[in-house]
Amino acid sequence: MNKQLLSCSLKSGKQVTMVVASVATDGVDQQVEISYYDQKVIGNGSFGVVFLAKLSTTNEMVAIKKVLQDKRFKNRELQIMRKLNHPNIVKLKYFFYSSGDKKDELYLNLILEYVPETVYRVARHYSKQRQSIPMIYVKLYMYQLLRSLAYIHSIGICHRDIKPQNLLIDPETGILKLCDFGSAKYLVRNEPNVSYICSRYYRAPELIFGATNYTNSIDVWSAGTVIAELLLGQPIFPGDSGVDQLVEIIKVLGTPTREQIQSMNPNYKEFKFPQIKAHPWNKVFRVHTPAEAIDLISKIIEYTPTSRPTPQAACQHAFFDELRSPDARLPSGRALPQLEMDGPNEVSATGGDMAGPSA
């Protein structure tokens, strides 16, 4: 098992760390010696710490995610990330293990490509300026999010924590990359999963109802709430607690029917809810919100999990037609990043007609 090798200072004052790391490509058992410097903390949480650093050989910026490793188990995030290869998913380059301060403490270090911004920070910037995020960005970022979901779902992986903070973007190119697979899991039919997953504002209602046999459609719901947030300038369902989260959803969708509750969790037996009518979608959003955007959200933010479109089908919605125009450009005048459905796992689209609002 790899251990951190050496940390030293050069005459320039740079603190350089040298490690023996494993190449991240799945099925490749190769170790390389790498060194990095200019390490600084750029994020932390219950999972561990994220550092920004530069690789000495190339001066390439990387993010190093350091998490405490339980020696009894394989790290699920590492196993999943080694399988992933998609332009809209952050790339794992190398990984290595290091010792902690305490006896027998072991850390897993994931060396990832660095992407400078997040959808969360960009949306907050526009909100502080009392401006709406340009619609071309909403379309561009959300299309790429759906592409990334189409890919991971096609290989059986559910992300389970879609939120603006986990959507990395390069403002210059407009490319979006999904990150943080710490909650991700291969979902197997009839195998139970924990329902307390996903950040509250973006949590699908079946999770709030305690479902353990949920599907990839929880990611689709989360994606819908992110699109809605970009259009509104604030979260669409800002619940203060698990129960309050359901209240916020009911305010918009109305009280779920008995059949809808059964579709979310067949084992849920309590049906005592105040009867509230659905709020018209066009009154949820600002006056000038495109009808296609509202139509897409109304199809995604749906109680019955099987009624939500697949990510592939959502990508075909009329809301994204502008991206398919050869004349489409970023506000800077730069061409859009490559967006066609370009992989065998992204071609098929099931989930009904997603053409857009009827005339």
Swiss-Prot record:
Segments forming domain Protein kinase: 36-320
PANTHER family named in the record: GLYCOGEN SYNTHASE KINASE-3 ALPHA (PTHR24057), PROTEIN KINASE SHAGGY-RELATED (PTHR24057:SF0)
Region (Disordered): 330-359
Residues that bind ATP: 42-50, 65
GO CC annotations on file: axon; cytoplasm; cytosol; nucleus
InterPro entries: GSK-3, Kinase-like_dom_sf, Prot_kinase_dom, Protein_kinase_ATP_BS, Ser/Thr_kinase_AS, STKc_GSK3
Claim: Nucleotide-binding is one of the keywords in the record: yes
Catalytic function, reaction form: L-seryl-[tau protein] + ATP = O-phospho-L-seryl-[tau protein] + ADP + H(+); L-threonyl-[tau protein] + ATP = O-phospho-L-threonyl-[tau protein] + ADP + H(+)
Record family assignment: Belongs to the protein kinase superfamily. CMGC Ser/Thr protein kinase family. GSK-3 subfamily.
CDD domains noted in UniProt: STKc_GSK3
Biological process according to GO: cell differentiation; engulfment of apoptotic cell; establishment of mitotic spindle orientation; germ cell development; left/right axis specification; negative regulation of canonical Wnt signaling pathway; positive regulation of distal tip cell migration; positive regulation of engulfment of apoptotic cell
A Pfam family: Pkinase
Source species taxonomy: Eukaryota, Metazoa, Ecdysozoa, Nematoda, Chromadorea
UniProt GO molecular function: ATP binding; protein serine/threonine kinase activity
Keyword Nucleotide-binding: yes
Disulfide cysteine pairs (residue numbers): none
Described function: Phosphorylates oma-1, a regulator of the oocyte-to-embryo transition, enabling its degradation. Phosphorylates skn-1, preventing it from accumulating in nuclei and thus inhibiting phase II gene expression in the oxidative stress defense. Involved in mesendoderm specification and mitotic spindle orientation in EMS blastomeres. Thought to be a branch point in these processes as proteins downstream are not required. Negatively regulates Wnt signaling in vulval precursor cells and acts as a Wnt-independent repressor of med-1 and med-2 in the C lineage inhibiting mesoderm development.
PROSITE patterns recorded: PROTEIN_KINASE_ATP (PS00107), PROTEIN_KINASE_DOM (PS50011), PROTEIN_KINASE_ST (PS00108)
Name assigned to this protein: Glycogen synthase kinase-3
E.C. number(s) listed in UniProt: 2.7.11.26
Keywords linked to the UniProt accession: ATP-binding, Developmental protein, Kinase, Nucleotide-binding, Serine/threonine-protein kinase, Stress response, Transferase, Wnt signaling pathway
Self-association state and partner proteins as the record states: Monomer. Interacts with axl-1.
Name of the encoding gene: gsk-3
Record: active site: 161
